[in-house]
Amino acid sequence: MGSTICIDEKNINGDCYTIVSNPETNKIVLMVNTLRASQIVYLIRSNISQEALFAVSCVTRDMAPNYDWVARELFPNAYQVADKFHVVKNIIDQVQSVRIRYRQELLRKQRELEEASRKQPKLQPDPKIQQELKDLKKELSNGDTQLQLLQRSKGLLHKLPNEHTASQKLRARLLFRLFPDIKEAYKFSVALRKWYQRPMRNGTSITPSRHLLECKKKALLEIITNHLSSPCEEVKNIAHFIVKHIGEICNYFLGYKTNASAEALNQNLQRFISINYGTRNSDFFLYRIAVHFS
């Protein structure tokens, strides 16, 4: 089993598989076509000794609540780490939700204005409606309309500010000026992603410890405090998500553990599936996976 275990899920041909793996050997411990915690617990207990389960000291896992139950039930001596990449993905998804919300509002407004404009007499159109349509389709200083700006800003919201190109910096300034909720959500996400960076001392990474965890937890609470009552729903969602999982998130600083090996294993599985032209027979597919990856 090893002292560290990774729990992740993989979608294959529309079916969800739970994969329990050993990051030290990059081998699969269990791969089963279910997400139900009770079935996963039963299968692992049926095939692995209690001594091996008790020897596990760390479990890195997906954010799904069923995996929390699996980890607590099977590995009582292990601390849990919410995978860093899943946490960051959840945060970025909420930032993108703000962008999508604004875009949907503008599309609705444009549709309603165009419908109202068509109903106006051609010789005496309503100047207010025409002006609003004109403003909506007006080009900004970078050549984008507001709708194009929202559409083309998807990529820059995934990046940190120091990673933006010159055109992305200009687009970001326009985006944040016109859509303040996106600015708030993005700034919040950047602060959280910087919080996740390993602290350095004299050019080297500080050794993970319980003291470091407590310091980082205090810093995280300071970051999210002002956002718990934000008027932006997506920002509140991020803050409450962090509060709900703060223990598992901060446990990252006990050993800098992530699910990176599980994600790499998923990619190897995907390549294996592609090389073998998909998975037509599930039982035979699982047998071949066991031969190659366990």
Where would I find each of the regions flagged by the language model?
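Hydrophobic "anchor" residues on beta-strands that sit immediately upstream
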Residues: 4, 58, 79-82
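Acidic/histidine-rich catalytic cores and adjacent linkers
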Residues: 13-16, 23-25, 33, 51-75, ...
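Conserved nucleotide-binding/hydrolysis micro-motifs of P-loop NTPases
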Residues: 11, 36-37, 64-66, 87-89
